[in-house]
Amino acid sequence: MGKIIIQSLTTEKPISVMGMEAGICWGGDVTDEEKNYKRGLDCLQSGHLRTAEYPQVYMVLDGYSARVIREFYTHIAGGPTRLQASTRYINYKDFDCIVPPKVSKDPLATITYLEAIENTQTALQTLEKAGVPKEDSANLLPLGMATKVVVRTNLRNLIDMAHQRLCSRAYWEFRILMNDIIEALAYYSSEWENLVKQHKIFKPKCAVCGFCEEKYSCGAYPTKEQNDEYIKLGKLIKNKDFTSLLLYLTDEDKHNLVKLLSLEK
C-alpha cells in the first residue's frame, strides 16, 4: 500500500505541549517539564481535548488512492490544510493504481481491472501525442490512482478521525491509512509512542462509548439498544426489582437466577 512520512515540523512532545498550554490558563508552573507532562495526561484522561488542538502533525501521505484521499479531506476539524500532487503539471501516463483486495483475490476480476487501467494509460499516451495538455487528459485519471498529499493537522483531529475510521465498517483503505498514520506517529518520538501504545488514544468510537451506533454492527460491542437494555437490567438487579426483572428473562435465566440467589444466602 502507501507510506506515511512524519515531517520534522511535527510537535515532538505533544503531551507536554498540551500540559504547558493548559498550565498557562490554570496559572500553573509551565517551566517544569514533568508537571507539564502530567498536566497534559490529565487533560487527555479527563477528556479536555481542546488542548489536543495544539500539537501539530505535518505528514506526507504517499501511494494511497485518490478515492481514499477524498474521504480523508472530509475531516476538517481544527483547521487542517493540505496540498495534493498536481494533475496539471505531473505526467501520469504510467500512473500506479490501487487494486482492492476483493479484486486481487479473483483472477478474472484482476485481469479485467488491470486491462481497464492499461486502456486508460494507452489513451493518455495517445492524447499526449495528439498535443492535448496534461490538465485536460487528466480528466481520464481514475479514483483508484495512487497520489501524494502533504498534510498539516492536529492531535484532536486525528483522535476524532480514528473514532470513525478504525470502525470495522469504514472503507478498507482508510482503515489501512489510519493504522499507517498511527504507526508512523508512534515511531516519531517517545511521547507519541506513549500516546499510541500506553494510553491508546486512537481507537474506534465503540471502544470509547462502550456500544456500537452502527445499524449493521460487527458484534464487537453491543448495539446502543442492547446497551440500554443492559443498563435497565442492571438497575433492576441493583434495586432487587425481581417482578420487573422476570419480564426480561427466559425460563433458563429464571432458573439460573434462583440458583444464584440461593448461593448468596
Located regions from the model:
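Family-specific signature for flavin-dependent thymidylate synthase
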Residues: M1-K265
